[in-house]
Amino acid sequence: MQTAEIELKFPIHDLAGLQSRLPGLGFQLGTPRTFEQNTLYDTPSRTLRAVKQILRIRHYGDLWIVTHKRPADPAADGDPARSGDRLSSSDAAGYSAAASYKVRIETETLLDDGPALAAIFHQLGFEPVFRYEKFRTEWSHATPTIDGPLFTNPALPAELPIGRHLVLDETPIGDYAELEGPPAWIDRTLARLGVDPATCLTDSYGSLFLDWKQRTGSPVDNLTFDEIPTTASLLPRFP
């Protein structure tokens, strides 16, 4: 399925407190806290990174999911200055955008056998370049259609569906929330949650990982609980 992905992240300092408020704001729990493993693939010459695309296999609970993401504006492909990427020697870099909202076209589908697809990727010349893990809790919001146009960027296909979701991610380097939906709904939800828009981010987890490495001097290569042990990794992986 292909969808328009419009989202913002913000750091969470009180995960339990935030979750306790969500039902009163019209959110419904979609998926309880579930362990998630992600692997990004690219060619040895980083062909996908050069055009701001990602190819990912995700293991989410019992599910395997393959995802491709690309910029909503083809003119931004391959232009680090426009996309806001900070390229470096790390394979985690180059998979983020910087704007008021992060806007991507996402195509994904469920898999029966993730390792089999990984083997196919290998035969086609794609190799694992970055791994990241988190515990994710998914909430959805049933909002009446009062937001007006979902998005006015002519580069974004108008026929693509846009949901309204909030996900809570517990990563080895901190907790983050992602709001995904029409910009008007995102802005209204941030206000209802009391989140300062100045604290919001469009960085990918790869970029957040690089920032963390620069601050800490850590030599690790992946954003995983094995490489960055935290108390979160000691909690049950499935509720």
What role is predicted for each listed range?
Residues E5-E7, I173-Y176:
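Phosphate/nucleotide-binding catalytic core
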Residues H59-G61, P172, P183:
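A generic beta-sheet turn/junction motif
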Residues I12-L15, P182-I186:
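Helix N-cap motif at beta-to-alpha junctions
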Residues A184, L190-L201:
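A hydrophobic, small-residue-rich beta->alpha segment in the mid-to-C-terminal subdomain
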Residues L166-I173, E180:
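A contiguous pocket-lining binding segment that forms or flanks enzyme active sites
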Residues S83, L87, R192-G194:
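Edge beta-strand at a domain terminus
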Residues M1-P80, L87-G163, T199-P239:
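N-terminal strand-loop-strand beta-hairpin
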